[in-house]
């Protein structure tokens, strides 16, 4: 018995889910100024006689519909008293999907929208969408059924940027504040001191520098070598006279 109840609950839940998912009318979020398509659709194997789009959380809501699409008369805009432009277009050839187009969305468009879809020629094959019972043999098999779905349009306001204030200075010298003299950076003109051209910003190595470097190495290197050898010899005891040692 428990298994039967669970199975029945699963079947009822699946049927309810099928009811709620039959009409697709999904939420949309867009920035102000963007082009927005509010698409309401049902499966293409359904037969649609009328699709009505309106403002509000529930159908009607005391407001006129925005747009109506019918399978035989095409589409037309009623605008429902709103002062903004709309376009309604069939999306597919089977006339089971329409898009309400808002070319320049503003904060006035934000809110809930409803989509009422009227199905026609309901049959046993799609009987789960129709009001009928298996024991009835009447026109209720073919009765029209209206399904409703709602969505919410969220409009993100445009970011406002504060205007830049430009301050223009007059050329009059009577009110010009006194400015302290600013020391200027030395120019990049090289200074010549004798045979050595000196540029403090871009020093360049000349032949004079190389010649002085070679002379310095030639003079200083032997002197340093002699000093180093002498120090090593002194540390090693060279030249010291040892006891018992008589030089020849």
From Swiss-Prot:
Glycosylation sites: 27, 37, 45, 73, 83, 92, 95, 104, 116, 121, 131, 144
Transmembrane spans: 210-230
Compartment list: Membrane
Disulfide bonds, paired cysteine numbers: 40-115
Organismal lineage: Viruses, Duplodnaviria, Heunggongvirae, Peploviricota, Herviviricetes
GO cellular-component term (any): membrane
UniProt family annotation: Belongs to the Epstein-Barr virus BILF2 protein family.
Keyword annotations from UniProtKB, A to Z: Disulfide bond, Glycoprotein, Immunoglobulin domain, Late protein, Membrane, Signal, Transmembrane, Transmembrane helix
Signal peptide: 1-17
Chain intervals with Basic residues compositional bias: 175-188
Protein name: Glycoprotein BILF2
Ig-like domain ranges (all copies): 19-125
Topology of this chain in the membrane: Single-pass membrane protein
Xref: SUPFAM superfamilies: Immunoglobulin (SSF48726)
Species for this entry: Epstein-Barr virus (strain B95-8) (HHV-4)
């Amino acid at each position: 018995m428990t298994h039967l109840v669970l199975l029945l609950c699963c079947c009822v839940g699946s049927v309810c889910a099928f009811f709620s998912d039959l009409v697709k009318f999904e939420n949309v979020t867009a920035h102000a100024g963007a082009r927005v398509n509010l698409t309401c659709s049902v499966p293409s194997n359904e037969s649609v006689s009328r699709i009505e789009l309106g403002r509000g959380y529930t159908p009607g809501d005391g407001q006129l519909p925005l747009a109506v699409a019918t399978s035989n008369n095409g589409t037309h805009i009623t605008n429902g008293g709103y002062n903004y432009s709309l376009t309604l277009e069939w999306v597919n050839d089977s006339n089971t999907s329409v898009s309400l187009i808002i070319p320049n969305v503003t904060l006035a468009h934000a809110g809930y929208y409803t989509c009422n879809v009227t199905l026609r020629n309901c049959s046993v094959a799609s009987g789960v969408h129709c009001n009928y019972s298996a024991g009835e043999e009447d026109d209720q098999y073919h009765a029209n059924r209206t399904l409703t779905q709602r969505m919410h349009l969220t409009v993100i306001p445009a970011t406002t940027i504060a205007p830049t204030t430009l301050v223009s200075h007059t050329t009059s010298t009577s009110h010009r504040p006194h400015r302290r003299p600013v020391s200027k950076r030395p120019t990049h003109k090289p200074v010549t001191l004798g045979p050595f051209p000196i540029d403090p910003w871009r020093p360049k190595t000349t032949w004079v520098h190389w010649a002085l470097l070679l002379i310095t190495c030639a003079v200083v290197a032997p002197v340093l070598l002699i000093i180093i050898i002498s120090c090593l010899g002194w540390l090693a005891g060279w030249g010291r006279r040892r006891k018992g040692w008589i030089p020849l």
